[in-house]
């Protein structure tokens, strides 16, 4: 129990803290399509009667949550 622990050398960890420099890009000068679609128009799934929804509804009702149906 009289052994003293050697301090841990953290020199290698500190080297990882440096960041790589990248040249600045001119994004303002790019021609962009005004009508570009970022995602599909039908991204919102309106089908609330699929298997997952039914299982989730049943599980929530088991825990006391009352689900409203349209």
Curated annotation (Swiss-Prot):
InterPro entries: DSS1_SEM1. Keywords: Nucleus, Proteasome. It comes from Homo sapiens. Component of the 19S proteasome regulatory particle complex. The 26S proteasome consists of a 20S core particle (CP) and two 19S regulatory subunits (RP). The regulatory particle is made of a lid composed of 9 subunits including SEM1, a base containing 6 ATPases and few additional components. Belongs to the TREX-2 complex (transcription and export complex 2), composed of at least ENY2, GANP, PCID2, SEM1, and either centrin CETN2 or CETN3. Component of the homologous recombination repair (HR) complex composed of ERCC5/XPG, BRCA2, PALB2, DSS1 and RAD51. Interacts with the C-terminal of BRCA2. Component of the 26S proteasome, a multiprotein complex involved in the ATP-dependent degradation of ubiquitinated proteins. This complex plays a key role in the maintenance of protein homeostasis by removing misfolded or damaged proteins, which could impair cellular functions, and by removing proteins whose functions are no longer required. Therefore, the proteasome participates in numerous cellular processes, including cell cycle progression, apoptosis, or DNA damage repair. This is 26S proteasome complex subunit SEM1. The keyword Nucleus applies. It comes from the Eukaryota. One of its GO terms (cellular component) is cytosol. GO terms for biological process: double-strand break repair via homologous recombination; mRNA export from nucleus; proteasome assembly; proteasome-mediated ubiquitin-dependent protein catabolic process. Pfam families: DSS1_SEM1. PANTHER family: 26 PROTEASOME COMPLEX SUBUNIT DSS1, 26S PROTEASOME COMPLEX SUBUNIT SEM1. Belongs to the DSS1/SEM1 family. It is found in: Nucleus. Expressed in limb bud, craniofacial primordia and skin. The gene is SEM1.
């Amino acid at each position: 129990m009289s052994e003293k622990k050697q301090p841990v050398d953290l020199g290698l960890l500190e080297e990882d803290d440096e960041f790589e420099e990248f040249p600045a890009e001119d994004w303002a000068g790019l021609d962009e399509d005004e009508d570009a679609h970022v995602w599909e128009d039908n991204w919102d799934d309106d089908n609330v009667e699929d298997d997952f929804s039914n299982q989730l509804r049943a599980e929530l009702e088991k825990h006391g949550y009352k689900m409203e149906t349209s």
